[in-house]
Amino acid sequence: MKSTLENKIAVVTGGSGAIGSAIIAALEQQGVCAVSLDMTHPAAAPFQACDVRDDGSVAAAIAKVQDTYGRLDLVVHAAGVSREAVLWKLAVEDWDFVQNVNLRGAFLLLRHAIPVMRAGEGGRIVLIGSINGSRGKFGTSAYSASKAGLIALAKTVAREVARLKILINIVEPGWVRTPLTDSLPQAVRDAALAESLVGRYVEPADVAAAVSFLCGPGAQQITGQILRVDGGQSLGSV
């Protein structure tokens, strides 16, 4: 059966990362042409160099996608970084770096992508947040604040773009198993796993499946919402 997403054009920031590359793979399975916007080239998928912190870089990347494909249907902001320390020990430079990638990057992406989407047939936007954006976590003030900012951004933009046939939502993963998290101390990984009600880590493919759903026909009445993919981690211990 032909996918309703077949031949759609997507951009995915952070497409070289574990989550971003899983999202690209999931969209490609639905027949989407998914372009990775990142500073490094992934193993597969169309690629456009982009520094999400820089307005000119984002503008040029979106313009290149429009020139190449003629439209833009799906936008996913999966680029994300973290710098961890208790607030009074967190360097200003680290705070700024996290905000510039996670939150400013989302703003710049939407600022340039929405005019292209509205010139076409509308589309879907998905921001990759974190359960820590809703609940906070010790030592992650910069990261948690940036992800909390995505919530307000999505809810506000949802009101602004609905009449343009554009829907925007957030996927909030819990602890995702990636090469980075696998390198952390066993005690840290065990603590995260203990919070999961289903007894396993979230995999990048789990996040990608949620993104695919929000981009598909089953999500036509969903906008400005948070979809948590955390195995119940945000509910706390039972």
Give the residues covered by each predicted segment:
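Alpha-helical segment proximal to the catalytic Tyr-Lys
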Residues: 115, 159-160, 220
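Active-site loop immediately N-terminal to the catalytic Tyr-X3-Lys motif
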Residues: 88, 135-141, 163-164, 199, ...
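Short C-terminal tail/terminal secondary-structure segment
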Residues: 135, 212, 223-238
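Residue(s) in the substrate-gating loop at a strand-loop-helix junction
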Residues: 130
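Active-site helix of classical SDR
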Residues: 110, 146, 154
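Short, small/polar-rich loop/turn modules that mediate ligand/substrate recognition or access, typified
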Residues: 122, 162, 167, 222-224
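Substrate-binding pocket helix/loop in short-chain dehydrogenase/reductase
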Residues: 86-87, 94-96, 181, 192
